[in-house]
């Protein structure tokens, strides 16, 4: 990976994206809500029951600019769910700021193993025994 791309990833201005798609939220409090899902690449938790093990290796997914990610979400749904992998391996501030400028409701699905970044309307915390949440995960 070149230095420029690495810097964009560190700043959260670009992210490894496995997939992004419009669908109906199928679980939890917002079940049945039309949503746009953004699935980030990268996860070091290693849950043996994971249904998206393909997301674990961040290097196997394209690095996409936040501008492009947000552009693709425009007009599809007012609810955006960021999931993974483990999205909090990355700085979510630029993505959520850009989504908020479009008046999107931002939801995240996380293990809580990394510090919370971003501006979220809904946090779905799913602790994992393999890598426990950091204490701050319970304070937000």
Predicted segments, located by residue:
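Short, flexible, glycine/charge-rich loop motifs used to bind or transfer phosphoryl groups or to couple energy/partner
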Residues: 26-27, 69-72, 112-116
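Structural preference for beta-strand elements that scaffold enzyme active sites
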Residues: 35-37, 49, 79-81, 105-107, ...
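Flexible, charged surface loops at secondary-structure boundaries
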Residues: 31-32, 73-76, 100, 116-119
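Glycine-/small-residue-rich active-site loops that bind phosphorylated ligands and cofactors
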Residues: 57, 87-88
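Conserved AdoMet/S-adenosylmethionine-binding subsite of the radical SAM
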Residues: 88-140
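Conserved alpha-helical substructure of the radical SAM core
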Residues: 51-81
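N-terminal [4Fe-4S]-dependent radical SAM core
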Residues: 1-62
């Amino acid at each position: 990976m070149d230095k420029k791309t690495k810097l964009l990833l560190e700043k959260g201005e670009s992210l490894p994206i496995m997939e992004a798609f419009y669908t109906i939220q199928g679980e939890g409090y917002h079940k049945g809500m039309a949503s746009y899902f953004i699935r980030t690449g990268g996860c070091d938790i290693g849950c043996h029951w994971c249904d998206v093990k393909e997301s674990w290796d961040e290097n196997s997914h394209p690095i996409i600019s936040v501008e492009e990610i947000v552009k693709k979400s425009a007009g599809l749904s007012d609810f955006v769910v960021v999931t993974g992998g483990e999205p909090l391996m990355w700085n979510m501030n630029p993505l959520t700021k850009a989504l908020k400028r479009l008046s999107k409701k931002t939801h995240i699905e996380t293990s809580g193993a990394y510090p919370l970044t971003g501006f979220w309307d809904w946090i779905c915390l799913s602790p994992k025994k393999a890598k426990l949440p950091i204490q701050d995960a319970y304070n937000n």
